[in-house]
């Protein structure tokens, strides 16, 4: 009997909602990346996008240590000479907490052609509300040790 090879149309995609309140950023990113890639499914294949949709809410309440809020830097470059900008994660969390969480999750995904397709299934919101109630997302609980 030949080995089963999943195809892109064979998978049924679910919607998961993750509440980021008091969850460590790295643990949240790993859990979301695994759901996005479909590593929790028995039909996982690294060359097929068989993952689920993930909604992250309360991104502004994610747990980041004070040391990292002050000292960890986020870099961006405009492409022009001398165009390097660096900001602390604390500054970014004040203005755009959803971007900080999204960047952490995307950083956990593979760097290949499939990555953009996987990233399109991620939705991050700073507050508790999201516009995806019609998809009936299932709450996903991240098991972690108390801080």
From Swiss-Prot:
Signal peptide stretch: none
Keyword NAD attached: no
Gene Ontology MF: a single term: structural constituent of ribosome
PROSITE patterns documented for this protein: RIBOSOMAL_L13 (PS00783)
Xref: Gene3D superfamilies: Ribosomal protein L13
Record text on subunit structure and interactions: Part of the 50S ribosomal subunit.
NCBIfam families named in the record: rplM_bact
Family of the protein in this entry: Belongs to the universal ribosomal protein uL13 family.
Role: This protein is one of the early assembly proteins of the 50S ribosomal subunit, although it is not seen to bind rRNA by itself. It is important during the early stages of 50S assembly.
Name by which UniProt lists this protein: Large ribosomal subunit protein uL13
Organism: Mycobacterium marinum (strain ATCC BAA-535 / M)
Gene that this sequence comes from: rplM
């Amino acid at each position: 009997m030949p080995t089963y090879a999943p195809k892109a149309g064979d998978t049924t995609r679910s919607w998961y909602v993750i509440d980021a309140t008091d969850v460590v950023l790295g643990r949240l990113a790993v859990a979301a990346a695994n759901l996005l890639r479909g590593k929790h499914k028995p039909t996982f294949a690294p060359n097929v996008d068989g993952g689920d949709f993930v909604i992250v809410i309360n991104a502004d309440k994610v747990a980041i240590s004070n040391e990292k809020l002050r000292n960890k830097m986020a870099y961006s470059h405009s492409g022009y000479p001398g165009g390097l900008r660096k900001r602390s994660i604390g500054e970014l969390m004040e203005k755009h907490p959803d971007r900080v969480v999204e960047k952490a999750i995307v950083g956990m995904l593979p760097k290949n052609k499939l990555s953009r397709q996987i990233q399109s299934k991620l939705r991050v919101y700073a507050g508790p509300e999201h516009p995806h109630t019609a998809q009936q997302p299932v709450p996903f609980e991240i098991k972690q040790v108390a801080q």
